[in-house]
């Protein structure tokens, strides 16, 4: 049935349903039904009731939109559906946001369906009933998936199901994790899962922002201990410097800077930002964007609080009281045993990661052994452990004694030493890290020096080199302390761009940075499995930081793949990938205007125990791995000398004050300048192909205009011509559509892009395409190939694929001198002159490529009663000709045209008379 007829039928049926009648085919009777709401064009999903007993339950699509269009939420099994709706943003970007709980996923600890415009995400949070005694950190897992149906597609997989998480989904998981994790209370070790499923997308809002808000709301209404809620927002900075809150995807693509933010009422939890144009944005602009994003995120918190107040569950206890007592006692004991020796170890200012790590591991074993000995000696709370320790150790006997007494009391009077050791075991690693962190912070605040002896603003020793590998298009090695990255750049054509299948964002990307973190870089044995989420996340951050530096595709029509191999790691390996990648791009001849450097800024703080306010803080430039583990923040900042191109914030406490982040931007700017100095010393600017500076293996590109009427000739039937050129030269050729009003031809011009693996291939391809793109001029002398032999001459093809006729009379000035040896076989090449090129076709002349011989007399014209004889087919594959036959003669005659006894050519009329006489 045609689509129009089907649509008309559905419309007629809908009108009858709306009037309350559905007539039979014959029209003899009608069945009354309950009138329904008007059916939408897409189908029946919003119909309240349907003939035949459909339930009156409203469709999810209607209920998940804002309250003005949703039906009254029904009650299921005594549970009430609660919903909170708000409108956020400015007049231009105003968006309806809703949070609903109680309709779906009611068995989860907490579940919320969040909506922003027509983007809908289902978020659920669950947790284990008991804590994991083996967990050394909080076991939180986040899963984020985008259903293909959310944006009206069927998956292109073989099974037509969604496959493993895409990179975009993995990055969204990391965003949600980093926004939620800092707000879980210390000591909570129950395995917890947060799952987000995007059910619908209007393809204008980033679902990751909605996922953070929805997951926060799900935790807020659950019984899971959590110090939220948290709000998330996205802001964009346009070319005029104006900041737009909750921008659409189109707004983001046209902006200079896009920032995704999550925070609480007064602190920042997570930041991700990227510059969209070369050069980045100044620190002042980033600070303003952070402030605007914080205000936009705060607007998301109040609706969640209202929802939790209406439908939230009572929070469970963080942990058992005995566990909490044991953990605190073990921390006190380990700190008392380790403080003095850690102070002495840090004072050594060991530069090597491996040497420092070995000493810290030995110290840890010694402390644990002493604690076990103290436990074995102290049989009851009154018995004190030995106070003697190794030389240099400072041990508080009373603290250790009190700690063991608390552990014994928490374990119970009947607990033996084995039970007590088991109770303490799960807290030892955390207690030792706490001691290391406490001593490190005291050293920073007291002396202004760090574990390896550096000052707070001092960065580790730098080393940089370019062109470290042969054959590759570009390569570099960047080293900062014990962090080292080897990068390679490979340039490809625009056919090599990565196609993206995402509801929002660009359709493809020209720069692909693949970050690798092998186990040997941290002296560990290999792990099983594919890419980790960490590798995907670090690679994406480095890629976004460098992507803005690439010229536009019109100025530099290439795709680039960067491989960043982490060969050593002691912190900030993703920032080393940015630095090494920038150098590799310049080494490959990618015309980026300036280097992109990167640095990580750490933080140590002291807080007021009563209020939680930060009383002291210190920023650490270029943090190493130990400072990342023991500190409070990892603030990764990439950019040029003039601005910031990429940002990512991870934090451990329940957020960082915004003022500290703004201060960190200036610290990073100073440190980044020193990093770029080292990079410029290795390679100050991008290498230039026109100066012969790039590798001989580097690809080349050339663009030329082509007349619109010649595009078909270049492509050929079924692409035959362009494929043959690509096959013979090794180049890749792309043809853009004609530009109306272009400089070539009245009908406009097309653009031909030629990408070749090296200069030789490029020159050959340019010559071939140039011959086709240049119209054949009358009077030009060209080399042509014989492609067919006719009775009257030869069909030739020029390098520009123009075909024309070389008549036999145009072969030689003196037709009488045409000999058998002069015949042109198929495939032979001949130099000819273009005598005609127009609507009537193209004609060539061989004889006009040279001057006529002395004494040459042109043959009489046909108008004077003469005329040239009609020649027969030359040797070759002419119709009806056999091998060995001469031009115009019999087989074996060895002559040219038919002649009189005196050698003159017989005229056609004379030959006809002779043949007639012979027949008589």
Where are these regions (language model features)?
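Extended amphipathic alpha-helical scaffolds
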Residues: 68-128, 316-505, 699-713, 721, ...
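Mobile "lid/hinge" segments at catalytic clefts and subdomain interfaces of large enzymes
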Residues: 223-351, 585-692
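Conserved phosphate/anionic-ligand binding catalytic regions in large, soluble enzymes, centered on
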Residues: 110-113, 120, 205-224, 465-489, ...
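N-terminal mitochondrial targeting presequence
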Residues: 1-77
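Long, basic N-terminal domains or extensions that often function
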Residues: 70-319
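Long, charged amphipathic helices and adjacent flexible linkers at domain junctions
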Residues: 311, 318-322, 674-705, 763-783
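Glycine-rich, flexible beta-strand/loop modules in the N-terminal catalytic cores of phosphate-handling
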Residues: 108-205, 265, 286, 468, ...
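Single-stranded RNA-binding regions, centering on S1/OB-family and related RNA-binding modules
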Residues: 697-699, 706-920
């Amino acid at each position: 049935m045609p689509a129009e007829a089907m649509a008309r039928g559905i419309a007629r049926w809908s009108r009858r349903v709306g009037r309350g009648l559905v007539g039979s085919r014959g029209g003899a009777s009608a069945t009354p039904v309950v009138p329904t709401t008007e059916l939408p064009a897409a189908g029946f999903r919003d119909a309240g009731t349907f003939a035949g007993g459909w339930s009156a339950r409203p469709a999810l699509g209607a209920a998940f939109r804002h309250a003005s269009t949703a039906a009254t939420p029904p009650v299921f099994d005594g549970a009430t559906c609660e919903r909170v709706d708000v409108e956020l943003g400015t007049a231009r970007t105003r968006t309806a946001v809703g949070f609903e709980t109680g309709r779906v996923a009611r068995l989860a600890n907490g579940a919320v369906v969040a909506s922003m415009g027509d983007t809908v995400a289902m978020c659920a949070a669950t947790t284990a009933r008991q804590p994991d005694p083996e967990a050394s950190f909080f076991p939180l897992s986040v899963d984020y998936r985008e259903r293909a149906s959310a944006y009206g597609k069927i998956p292109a997989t073989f099974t037509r199901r969604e496959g493993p998480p895409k990179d975009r989904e993995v990055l969204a998981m990391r965003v949600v994790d980093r926004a939620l994790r800092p707000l879980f209370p210390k000591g909570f070790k129950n395995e917890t899962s947060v799952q987000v499923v995007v059910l619908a997308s209007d393809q204008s809002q980033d679902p990751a922002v909605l996922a953070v808000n929805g997951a926060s709301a799900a935790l807020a209404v659950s019984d899971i201990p959590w110090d939220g809620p948290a709000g998330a927002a996205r802001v964009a900075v346009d070319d005029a410097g104006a900041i737009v809150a909750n921008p659409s995807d189109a707004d983001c693509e046209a902006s200079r800077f896009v920032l995704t933010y999550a925070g609480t009422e007064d602190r920042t939890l997570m930041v991700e930002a990227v510059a969209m144009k070369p050069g980045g944005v100044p620190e002042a602009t980033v600070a303003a964007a952070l402030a605007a994003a914080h205000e936009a995120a705060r607007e998301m918190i109040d609706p969640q609080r209202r929802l939790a107040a209406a439908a939230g569950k009572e929070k469970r206890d963080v942990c058992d009281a005995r566990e909490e007592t044991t953990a605190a006692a073990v921390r006190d004991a380990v700190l008392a045993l380790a403080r003095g020796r850690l102070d002495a170890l840090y004072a050594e200012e060991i530069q090597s990661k491996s040497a420092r790590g070995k000493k810290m591991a030995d110290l840890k074993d010694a402390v644990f052994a002493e604690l076990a000995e103290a436990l074995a000696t102290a049989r009851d709370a009154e018995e004190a452990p030995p106070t003697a320790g190794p030389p240099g150790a400072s041990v508080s006997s009373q603290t250790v004694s009190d700690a063991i007494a608390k552990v014994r009391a928490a374990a119970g009077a009947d607990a033996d030493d084995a039970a007590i050791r088991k109770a303490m075991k799960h807290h030892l690693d955390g207690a030792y890290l706490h001691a290391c962190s406490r001593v490190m912070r005291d050293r920073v605040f007291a002396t202004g020096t760090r574990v390896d002896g550096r000052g707070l603003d001092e960065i580790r020793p730098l080393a940089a080199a370019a062109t470290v590998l042969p054959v590759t298009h570009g390569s570099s090695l960047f080293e900062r302390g014990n962090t080292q990255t080897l990068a390679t750049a490979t340039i490809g054509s625009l056919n090599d761009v990565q196609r993206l299948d995402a509801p929002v964002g660009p359709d493809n990307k020209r720069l692909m940075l693949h970050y690798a973190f092998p186990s040997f870089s941290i002296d560990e044995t290999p792990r099983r499995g594919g890419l980790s989420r960490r590798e995907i996340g670090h690679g994406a951050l480095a890629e976004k930081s460098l992507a803005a530096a690439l010229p536009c595709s019109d100025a530099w029509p290439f795709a680039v793949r960067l491989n960043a191999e982490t060969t050593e790691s002691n912190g900030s390996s993703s920032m080393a990938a940015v630095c090494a990648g920038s150098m590799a791009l310049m080494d490959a001849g990618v015309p980026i205007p300036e280097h992109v450097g990167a640095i990580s800024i750490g933080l140590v703080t002291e807080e007021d125990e009563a209020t939680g306010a930060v009383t002291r803080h210190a920023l650490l430039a270029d943090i190493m791995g130990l400072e990342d583990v023991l500190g409070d923040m990892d603030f990764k900042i990439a950019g040029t000398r003039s601005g910031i191109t990429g940002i990512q914030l991870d934090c451990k406490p329940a957020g960082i004050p915004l003022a500290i982040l703004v201060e960190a931007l200036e610290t990073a700017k100073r440190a980044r300048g020193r990093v770029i100095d080292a990079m410029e010393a290795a390679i100050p600017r991008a290498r230039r192909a026109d100066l012969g500076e790039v590798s001989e293996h580097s690809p080349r590109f050339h663009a030329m205009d082509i007349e619109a009427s010649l595009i078909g000739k270049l492509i050929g039937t079924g692409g035959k011509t362009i494929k043959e050129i690509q096959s013979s030269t090794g180049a890749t050729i792309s043809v853009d559509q004609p530009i109306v009003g272009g400089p070539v031809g009245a009908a406009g011009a097309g653009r031909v892009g030629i990408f070749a693996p090296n200069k030789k291939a490029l020159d050959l391809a340019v010559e071939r395409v140039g011959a086709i793109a240049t119209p054949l001029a009358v009077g030009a002398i060209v080399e042509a190939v014989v492609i067919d032999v006719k009775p009257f001459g030869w069909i030739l093809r020029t390098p520009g694929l123009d075909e024309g006729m070389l008549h036999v009379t145009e072969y030689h000035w003196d037709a009488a001198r045409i000999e058998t040896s002069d015949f042109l076989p198929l495939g032979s090449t001949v130099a000819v002159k273009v005598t005609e090129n127009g609507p009537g076709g193209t004609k060539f002349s061989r004889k006009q490529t040279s001057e006529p011989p002395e004494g040459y007399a042109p043959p009489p014209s046909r108008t004077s009663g003469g005329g040239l004889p009609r020649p027969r087919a030359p040797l070759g594959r002419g119709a009806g000709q056999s091998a060995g036959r001469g031009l115009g003669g019999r087989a074996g005659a060895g002559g040219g045209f038919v002649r009189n006894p005196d050698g003159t050519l017989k005229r056609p009329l004379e030959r006809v008379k002779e043949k007639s006489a012979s027949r008589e």
